[in-house]
From Swiss-Prot:
Catalyzes the interconversion of methylthioribose-1-phosphate (MTR-1-P) into methylthioribulose-1-phosphate (MTRu-1-P). The record marks 149 as: Transition state stabilizer. One of its GO terms (molecular function) is S-methyl-5-thioribose-1-phosphate isomerase activity. This is Methylthioribose-1-phosphate isomerase. Pathway: Amino-acid biosynthesis; L-methionine biosynthesis via salvage pathway; L-methionine from S-methyl-5-thio-alpha-D-ribose 1-phosphate: step 1/6. It comes from Anaeromyxobacter sp. (strain K).
Length: 339
């Protein structure tokens, strides 16, 4: 089956030195693009989830620094911009990785800085396509695949990680379909994953977040495929809040639980998931929906944006360098030493 060419949510306008971001807060109602000309504006867009997904925000940050360099920012301004971008979201390691990589080039001519940002983008899309190729054979024939949040083209430079596996499986002729859970409170599954898959002609059915266990018990789910925001050296995985619960359910029902992520998401300097900083977002994102309050005034709410899935619950981690199974720590170390 031929699948529609995926969107690329982060673009660079060379003629005008602008970062163009697909406003993911406006989806699915409107396909709206924002044009940003400063690192401050891009950092704000990362913080408020205009652009989201660990690889995508890394690409956005790289282009933000390229904009600053091309517009003549001096060393002090570039250092401040890099620091601001790196701190925009603490859990997603791709962001800090991209900023570190760009920072090493900030003393070079502006054209070289932009070339490095383009390289980060191109490498991420190539990694996603390789992840898809390695992950597709893991998906059972004609399976209904459960995914969480959005780890598709919208979350990357293009093609996707978890949805890259789905996309590659479909392109190979495997007649699979997808269950996308809505992913409260930002509704990435409902607004983004369902929109992206429907746009690309891949069968998708939307679920509420509490349905997965029952559908697993009924034999309606063949495997779970998710992305990641950070993978610790021991194989623990930080991903969108709710991922851990799905991993527990999958283990109980003896279903494969796969994590798809580029190597830039692997953080060998972080020993375990307990060492990963978890971003806490504002309570308003939980108690408000589409501008309307959905909980009584005065009732507090919590929103840890991510949780950590222990490596013991992960069947395999799929990166562009290879597929890692238990023991995950040894497998990740082997892939690291092979390059």
């Amino acid at each position: 089956m031929t699948v529609r060419e995926p969107l690329r949510p982060v673009l660079y306008d060379d003629a005008r030195d602008l970062v163009r971001l697909l406003d993911q807060k406006a989806l699915p109602a409107e396909e709206r693009w924002l044009e940003l000309s400063t690192a401050d504006a891009v950092a704000a867009a990362i913080r408020d989830l205009t652009v989201r997904g660990a690889p995508a925000i890394g690409v956005a940050a790289a282009y933000a620094l390229a904009v600053e360099a091309r517009r003549g920012a001096g060393p002090e301004r570039l250092r401040a911009a890099a620091d601001l971008l790196a701190r925009a979201r603490p859990t997603a390691v791709n962001l800090a990785w991209a900023v570190r990589r760009m920072s090493a080039r900030l003393g070079a001519p502006a054209a070289d800085v932009l070339a490095e940002a383009h390289a980060i983008r191109d490498e991420d899309e190539a990694a996603c396509r390789r992840i898809g190729a390695l992950g597709a054979p893991l998906v059972p024939a004609r399976a209904r695949v459960l995914t969480h949040c959005n780890a598709g083209a919208l979350a990357t430079a293009g093609y996707g990680t978890a949805l890259g596996v789905v996309r590659a499986a479909v392109e190979s002729g495997n007649a699979i379909s997808v269950f996308a859970d809505e992913t409260r409170p930002f509704l990435q599954g409902a607004r983004l994953t369902a929109w992206e898959l429907h746009r690309d002609g891949i069968p998708v059915t939307l679920l509420t977040d509490g349905m997965a266990g029952w559908l697993m018990a009924r034999g309606e789910i063949g495997c779970v495929v998710v992305g990641a925001d950070r993978i610790a050296a021991n194989g623990d995985v930080a991903n969108k809040i709710g991922t851990y619960a799905l991993a527990v359910l999958a283990a109980h029902h003896r279903l494969p639980f796969y994590v798809a992520a580029p190597w830039s998401t692997v953080d060998l300097a972080t020993p375990t998931g307990a060492d990963i900083p978890i971003e806490e977002r504002g309570a308003d994102e939980v108690v408000m929906l589409a501008g309307q309050r959905i909980a009584p005034a005065g009732v507090p709410a919590r929103y840890p944006a991510f949780d950590v899935t222990p490596a013991a619950l992960v069947t395999a981690i799929v990166t562009e360098r290879g597929v890692v199974r238990a023991p995950h720590a040894a497998g990740l170390a082997t892939l690291a030493s092979a390059r």
